Amino acid sequence: QIAGAEALNGTYFTSAYSAQDKDPHVQQFIKDYKAKFNEEPDTFAIHAYDGTLAVAEAIKQAGGTDGTKIAEALSKIKDLQVATGKYTLDKDHNPVSGGIIIEMKDGVQTFKQKITL
């Protein structure tokens, strides 16, 4: 073993999700996910959920399932409330989003703050 968990103390990293985030949308997602799957959600689960909400909204705005119309609708969605925040794409179709800062303490990820870009 080169280094133990204590070697990470005081280090920080960013993520899009932490179960420690007190945001009511995040906490509702966690509650619903645990009720359905009987396990804690991970980052991939919350991203899949957010993406599904965005596509569902685009289908609604497109008035159907035509792929071209859905793509156009996705690019026009602004500030759609999803579990991790607000969903918007920039002019190059990249998501505009924030994240969270996590600090490592004694081998445990500790939520520090939410950031918005």
Predicted feature locations:
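Extracytosolic ligand-binding ectodomains
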Residues: 1-117
